């Protein structure tokens, strides 16, 4: 039986999960409709669609595992279920960060202004950059999967009597946690570097505009600022998400820690829902479609009120 606070946190996290699914489903559907109409999907459309789908899967895995852990913990007892959840989590989590990193690099190469020959070379060969990131993702999986397989094979991670039993030292748990999330750390560092370079590009552009006495409210500056806001929002929200996941991992070592688990879950769900709304507001096509849907819903509501009167 859940306490009042646990019930409140579960309701909040469920609402966040629904918001994340709705927002990311909207992003995926808009891009799929564009593909159906144009018979072609742009790079940005492909990245946004992949990011939205991976976030939907991420939310479904988290919320499903949470409800099973709380209400039907005996379902997590079989070792093959633990192994399946672990593999799915690694694939979806790292794929989600991969798409987010690809999105940030795409914006960076399209918007930033640098004359360095490496930047110019990368800008002309953006497809090679994505292939390199795919290679990094595959290598990350190759490092992560054996760690999970060894943990399960050695019976170091079991679910007994409604609680996880971790049979390893804390130092070993930390090392395994780092190895299984190595790809996440790598892509997150790339995103931090990209955001830093975009800020430098904006600063140089503003100085150039000031020296030419052309003012600051030009289109390039606004695009820079909008993109930096999107990247910074992702960084902040993803840090909160990762903190929530880390709290849930800590719960593996603490018996009867449902309240702490709920708090971690609520924190983790802030990222997929809120950032999808930020992407919708930052993308002109997605924003236009969302406004049309809201206007349609408003018209339907007004029509219903007229029929009732």
From Swiss-Prot:
Q: Which Pfam families does the record associate with it?
A: TAS2R
- According to its record, how does it sit in the membrane? Multi-pass membrane protein
Q: Give the family this protein belongs to, as stated in its UniProt record.
A: Belongs to the G-protein coupled receptor T2R family.
One MF term in the entry's GO annotations: G protein-coupled receptor activity
In this entry, the parts of the chain located on the Extracellular side of the membrane are 1-7, 65-87, 149-182, 255-259
Cellular localization per UniProt: Membrane
- Keywords, sorted A to Z: G-protein coupled receptor, Glycoprotein, Membrane, Receptor, Sensory transduction, Taste, Transducer, Transmembrane, Transmembrane helix
GN (gene name) = Tas2r114
Instruction: Give the protein name, as stated in the record.
Output: Taste receptor type 2 member 114
* Glycosylation sites (chain numbering): 161
Additional notes on this entry: Several bitter taste receptors are expressed in a single taste receptor cell.
Which residue intervals are topologically Cytoplasmic? 29-43, 109-127, 204-233, 281-309
Please tell me the species this chain comes from: Mus musculus (Mouse)
């Amino acid at each position: 039986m859940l306490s009042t606070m646990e019930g409140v946190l579960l309701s909040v996290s469920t609402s966040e999960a629904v918001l994340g699914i709705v927002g990311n489903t909207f992003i995926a559907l808009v891009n799929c409709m564009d593909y159906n109409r144009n018979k072609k999907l742009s790079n940005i459309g492909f990245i946004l669609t992949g990011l939205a789908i991976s976030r939907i899967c991420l939310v479904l895995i988290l919320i499903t595992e949470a409800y099973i852990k709380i209400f039907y913990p005996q379902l997590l007892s079989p070792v093959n279920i633990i192994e399946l959840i672990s593999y799915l989590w690694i694939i979806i989590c790292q794929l989600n960060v991969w798409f987010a990193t690809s999105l940030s690099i795409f914006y960076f190469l399209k918007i930033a202004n640098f004359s360095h020959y490496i930047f110019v070379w990368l800008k002309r060969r953006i497809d090679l950059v994505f292939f390199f990131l795919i290679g990094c993702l595959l290598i990350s999986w190759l490092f992560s999967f054996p760690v999970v397989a060894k943990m399960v094979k050695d019976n170091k991670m079991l679910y007994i009597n409604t609680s996880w039993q971790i049979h390893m030292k804390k130092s070993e748990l930390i090392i395994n946690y780092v190895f299984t999330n190595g790809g996440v750390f790598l892509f997150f560092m790339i995103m931090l570097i990209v955001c830093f370079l975009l800020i430098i590009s904006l600063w140089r552009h503003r100085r150039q505009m000031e020296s030419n006495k052309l003012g600051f409210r030009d289109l390039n500056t606004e695009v820079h600022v909008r993109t930096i806001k999107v990247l910074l929002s992702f960084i902040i929200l993803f840090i909160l998400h990762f903190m929530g996941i880390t709290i849930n991992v800590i719960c593996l070592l603490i018996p009867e820690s449902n309240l702490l688990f709920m708090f971690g879950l609520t924190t983790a769900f802030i990222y997929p829902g809120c950032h999808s709304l930020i992407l919708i507001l930052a993308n002109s096509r997605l924003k236009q479609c969302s406004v049309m849907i809201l206007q349609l819903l408003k018209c339907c509501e007004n029509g219903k009120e007229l029929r009732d009167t």
